[in-house]
Amino acid sequence: MLELIAISEVNDALAEMVAFFRVELRSYKGLVSKPNVDVGREEMEEYLAAGFPVFAALVDDQYAGYVVCRVDSEVVWVESIFVKEEFRRHGVASALHSKAEEIAASYGDDTVYNYVHPNNHHMIEFLRKRGYTVLNLIEIRKPYKDEKLTQTITVGEHEFDY
């Protein structure tokens, strides 16, 4: 059975999921890394200290995923959403994302803003199926010193290093 719970403090299972989320994000940049549970715990503690709404999904009392929302001027952003591999394609992400939409609705809004890596094809497809088809903003920055950029992404007529 799937259950969503509000998170008020970090436990080991949640810290581990955050660590694996960071590993997955790095993989979109072609980087291989190992999960760092201490860093995952610290990241989640920062979200909670900042008052971000955080929810975890439990499936048969096992932690299956989580969503972190940021509310800024009554606009809801999904800061991160993660589902463990073995629980994917079972409605967990949909339930978590619906919770973010529920928060947005409580402010009178009918959309959630989502941060997505441009080559995170699974998340983009997930969002498209939920009706999220509008590209809102892109984030552009200078390369970091010694950063190795290995891909390019085209948006409209423009090509960007990634």
Predicted regions and their residues:
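Conserved GNAT acetyl-CoA-binding A-motif
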Residues: 104-116
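Conserved acetyl-CoA-binding loop-helix of GNAT-fold acetyltransferases
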Residues: 83, 89-102, 121, 125-129
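A short beta-loop-alpha structural element at the N-terminal edge
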Residues: 1-19
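A short helix-loop-beta-strand connector motif used in the catalytic cores of GNAT acetyltransferases and
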Residues: 42-56, 65, 77
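Conserved beta-strand-loop-alpha-helix junction that forms the acyl-donor binding cleft
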Residues: 114-123, 145
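Glycine-rich acetyl-CoA-binding "A-motif" of GNAT/NAT acetyltransferases
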Residues: 62-65, 122, 134
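A conserved beta-turn-beta hairpin within the catalytic core of GNAT-like acetyltransferases
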Residues: 70-79, 88, 135
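Conserved GNAT-fold acetyl-CoA-binding loop/helix
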Residues: 2-5, 22-44
